[in-house]
Amino acid sequence: MSKKDYYKLLGVDRNASTDEIKKAYKKLALKYHPDRNPGNKEAEEKFKEITAAYEVLSDSEKRAGYDRYGHEGASGGFDFSQGFGSAGDFSDIFNDFFGGEFGSSSRSKAKRSTTGVPGADLRYDLEITLEDAFKGIQAPIHYVTNVKCDMCQGRGSEGATKPVQCHTCQGSGRIRTQQGFFTIERTCTTCYGEGEIIQNKCKKCNGSGRRRDEVNISVSIPKGIEEGAKVRVSGKGEAGAKGGKSGDLYVYVKITPHKIFTRNKADLHCKVPIRMTLAVLGGEIDVQSIDGAKIKVKVPEGTQTSTKLRCKEKGMPYMNSYARGDLYVQIIVETLNPNNLTKKQIELLKALEEEENASIQQQSEGFFSKVKKK
């Protein structure tokens, strides 16, 4: 770190009072603090410089030495050789100076550490049918995860023995070391922030309070659930360590493609082939709905292929509702295959073609006669 003028670094003149120096430092420290500038090396370097300047100028003896002999006269100083570490360490360093502006106090951190380590949330991918999504089901779920140890009931200790206070940190879970102007606070390396040590560890879980095992549960999948939706099962994730809270299980739903129906939210769509004569003359067709019931669908005269006929409230149920979406039946008019026709049917079609040709001829002659008159 380059040796710059401490007064210029803090933006004060050489006759500034201690209060003026403190105010200037606080303003700059808030601006360049690593917590407010994550990953910014320039801000980190600036912060180191102003901190070193403040440590000297806020101390009357060091300031006098600096004013007389420069940097060589300012003995001591803060050791920056170890870097800043985590942002959480500096939250504790500045708590007293800035009134907790950079995070919670060390006391609250120690308190949290004694509650154990929470378990992770888990994800389970469940594939169901469209019929399952229509009616809702109780789905059996099987997975392997860390569960609470049944021998020590999650305590981690053997028998009735209880954890004892960590002798290194005296139960706080944090270790404080003095470095010049600052008090550095870090996680205790003996108890790893727990504040206590298990002397007689459970033989089954080795003191962790949990073990690997299979889990079998039944999960309620509501009717009307859509593709990609997730169902949260509270407390069925990974068990916490040292008595920590268990995570949650998230069941993500995938719906198997259906042979007949496609889905758009609560609406269903299907394609139904009909005879050409039915499309021309009109009539009724039977369509099976998703619940297995038969629906009578009216086909209007002159229906063209790709026409969609709507069946109200015959689709999927809406989530948490008694209402249902609609079913849309797309008509596909089949072309007649001469190989499947009888001789009489072919004769009738030929007669129909002759009739149509005669009608078209008359229409054409009438059209051209009108053109000639013009």
UniProtKB/Swiss-Prot annotation:
It holds the Pfam family DnaJ_CXXCXGXG. A zinc finger (CR-type) spans 136-214. One of its GO terms (molecular function) is heat shock protein binding. Zn(2+) 2 binds at C166, C169, C188, C191. Its cofactor is Zn(2+). It comes from the Bacteria. Keywords: Chaperone, Cytoplasm, DNA replication, Metal-binding, Repeat, Stress response, Zinc, Zinc-finger. Binds 2 Zn(2+) ions per monomer. CDD domains: DnaJ (cd06257), DnaJ_C (cd10747), DnaJ_zf (cd10719). The keyword Thylakoid does not apply. Its main location: cytoplasm. PROSITE patterns: DNAJ_1, DNAJ_2, ZF_CR. GO terms for cellular component: cytoplasm. Zn(2+) 1 binds at C149, C152, C202, C205. It is found in: Cytoplasm. Residues 5-70 form the J domain. CXXCXGXG motif repeats lie at residues 149-156, 166-173, 188-195, 202-209. One of its GO terms (biological process) is chaperone cofactor-dependent protein refolding. Belongs to the DnaJ family. Homodimer. NCBIfam families: DnaJ_bact, PRK10767.1. The J domain is necessary and sufficient to stimulate DnaK ATPase activity. Zinc center 1 plays an important role in the autonomous, DnaK-independent chaperone activity of DnaJ. Zinc center 2 is essential for interaction with DnaK and for DnaJ activity. Participates actively in the response to hyperosmotic and heat shock by preventing the aggregation of stress-denatured proteins and by disaggregating proteins, also in an autonomous, DnaK-independent fashion. Unfolded proteins bind initially to DnaJ; upon interaction with the DnaJ-bound protein, DnaK hydrolyzes its bound ATP, resulting in the formation of a stable complex. GrpE releases ADP from DnaK; ATP binding to DnaK triggers the release of the substrate protein, thus completing the reaction cycle. HAMAP family: DnaJ. This is Chaperone protein DnaJ. The lineage of its organism: Bacteria, Pseudomonadati, Pseudomonadota, Alphaproteobacteria, Rickettsiales. The gene is dnaJ.
